[in-house]
Amino acid sequence: MFEKPVVKSFQYGNHTVTLETGVMARQATAAVMASMDDTSVFVSVVAKKEAVAGQDFFPLTVNYQERTYAAGKIPGGFFKREGRPSEGETLTARLIDRPIRPLFPSAFKNEVQVIATVVSINPDVNPDMITMIATSAALSIAGVPFNGPIGAARVGHINGELVLNPSNTELANSKLDLVVSGTEAAVLMVESEADNLSEEEMLSAVVFGHDQQQVVIKAINEFAAEVATPSWNWEAPVVNAELKAQVAELAETRLSEAYQITEKMARYEQVGAIKSEVVAALLVQNEALDEREIRGMLGALEKNVVRSRIIAGHPRIDGREKDMVRALDVRTGVLPRTHGSALFTRGETQALVTATLGTQRDAQIIDSLMGEKKDHFLLHYNFPPYCVGETGFVGSPKRREIGHGKLAKRGIAAVMPSVEEFPYTVRVVSEITESNGSSSMASVCGTSLALMDAGVPIKASVAGIAMGLVKEGDDFVVLSDILGDEDHLGDMDFKVAGTNAGITALQMDIKIEGITKEIMQIALNQAQGARKHILTVMDEAISGAREDISQYAPRIHTMKISSDKIKDVIGKGGAVIRALCEETGTTIEIEDDGTIKIAATEGAAAKEAIRRIEEITAEVEVGKIYPGKVMRIVDFGAFVTVLGPKEGLVHISQIAEERIEKVADHLQVGQEVQTKVLEIDRQGRIRLSIKEATAELNPVAATEVKDAE
């Protein structure tokens, strides 16, 4: 039934990688089952032979999905099936998309969909690397015009050594988590989080990862040669040279002048007007022309105009030199009721960032195939349409917002205090209120400021900067603090976050081949200078965490009880702790070792909660008098609570000096009384006396009662 499948196995670091095709999903354009030490991923590629008429973009979609059966689990929740992609799945989909997208021809507009499904998981082998490898293999045997294959490698920095594809266990002790992907000749994508590593160490890790993944690229080429899928007979559309010349004649000079307007919205308006006028003029000359084709040529001309000016050494779009950072404005404490806030403005990019402190109960529970964990540091990035002067749909976060938030979080993670040092869950929200490039790096700067304003003891200030590149032949210019247009029209987006001591995050996306180690070194060094300049300005506004947290933030008080007393504080079905929280207005968390954390915005509430817990956990002593409350009345006496929930019996004979016929004539449920502990038996039952407590506390009254008898 099946033709003989093609299988390719090779050693990659400490792992054995296997690629297989020919058995599953035979109606797809291409499909590969890939495995790396029991972590298996199935990747399919479907590409349409024809593009949609008039389509002016490349519709590439990457879907990454983790099936719970891969880990031998059934999904939680009511529906018991996987739902919308998690944040982790979205980030992995972006990780796959970024290095493959620039390898398709710019004129290729056919729809391509990649679906990657994790079908088996080894908890110590992250599926993202094998998924990238499988995607590269599937595209390489699909016959589509794909200028690959690519390789992928994760690099760790453990005990001063670079480690290829470290396990999840090893990563816990690594100062670096770096993913690098590229072709045989060039690096295309880098995503990393680091603990203040130097520029030289980061560059060495990138080069190391690229060198190591040559094994993968060689294996995929051999795999593709064995599969031998015929290539598509796709050719780029022939460019209308006459129309291109007409467009250049009408628009080149005007576009060059327009790109000397430094204000973004005014420049956009002028460029838009020029394009509309050129389109109208050409359509008047020849109605048969395609407006989309004209606009495509105008876009290419616009790109060429901007790039030519930069290569020629002219000032940039907004008048800056290549290594200049835009004007900075830094403010903290801008919102009165938030726990911490900052407004960070860099040119026409602005972020309003807030920090909120919560208890450990507020931590994000992440339930992935690799297991469950809690995240006590959350960073959410919002990019509303108004920040670029547009209208648009406002709803759940898009892939880009999730990705930018993760990058900003990576930049800050290395300086965050541990939960033991600062027992709070911290949520940061970055609202981008203006955007003209590098909003994720503005979020890094704003987050550092807002955390300090909130009193979070971060280890150092962190700043981020986005670098760009324009390369024509052997000539190139590295740009600091790029604008949105420079990002769009340039060849590289290179984002670096870090402290004065080193780099904490690095993200790089390269659109062309030929980015050398020399260029990356220049970009890193130039970024270091820009980062330190920004840090100097930030430190003038606030250089360390405030001495105290906001008066509106919960204050966490810690106390310790014996672990065998935990059940007393919790109570039956959680009744005691629930009542404590409700009646004192606090949040109480109890750990297995008896550590209790009490969070309250008011000191008096915390003190009351502590007093009551101490009361509950205190040992009842024979002979001592305690205040109590009547809980139940029975024929032979009354049950009274002492020291919180502890309950003892006051026998009818121990209520008063005189003889009592009915307990209810002397005591009522809810009545507060003073009781003396007479005895605690072997079973822990407490015998109490109101009569003796009264005699000790009010001896005169007790004597009068005896005399009356």
Swiss-Prot record:
Xref: Pfam families: KH_1 (PF00013), PNPase (PF03726), RNase_PH (PF01138), RNase_PH_C (PF03725), S1 (PF00575)
Coiled coil segments of this chain: none
CDD domains: KH-I_PNPase, RNase_PH_PNPase_1, RNase_PH_PNPase_2, S1_PNPase
Keyword Iron-sulfur recorded: no
Signal peptide: none
Subcellular localization: Cytoplasm
Name of the top EC class for this enzyme: transferase
Keywords of this entry: Cytoplasm, Magnesium, Metal-binding, Nucleotidyltransferase, RNA-binding, Transferase
GO terms, molecular function: 3'-5'-RNA exonuclease activity; magnesium ion binding; polyribonucleotide nucleotidyltransferase activity; RNA binding
GO cellular component: cytosol
Biological process annotations from GO: mRNA catabolic process; RNA processing
Principal subcellular localization: cytoplasm
Sites where the protein binds Mg(2+): D487, D493
Keyword Iron-sulfur attributed: no
Domain of life: Bacteria
SUPFAM superfamilies reported for this sequence: Eukaryotic type KH-domain (KH-domain type I), Nucleic acid-binding proteins, Polynucleotide phosphorylase/guanosine pentaphosphate synthase (PNPase/GPSI), domain 3, Ribonuclease PH domain 2-like, Ribosomal protein S5 domain 2-like
S1 motif domain segment(s): 623-691
Catalytic activity: RNA(n+1) + phosphate = RNA(n) + a ribonucleoside 5'-diphosphate
Co-factor requirement: Mg(2+)
HAMAP family named among the record's database cross-references: PNPase
Function: Involved in mRNA degradation. Catalyzes the phosphorolysis of single-stranded polyribonucleotides processively in the 3'- to 5'-direction.
Subunit text: Component of the RNA degradosome, which is a multiprotein complex involved in RNA processing and mRNA degradation.
Family to which this protein belongs: Belongs to the polyribonucleotide nucleotidyltransferase family.
UniProt name for this protein: Polyribonucleotide nucleotidyltransferase
Species per Swiss-Prot/TrEMBL record: Aliivibrio salmonicida (strain LFI1238)
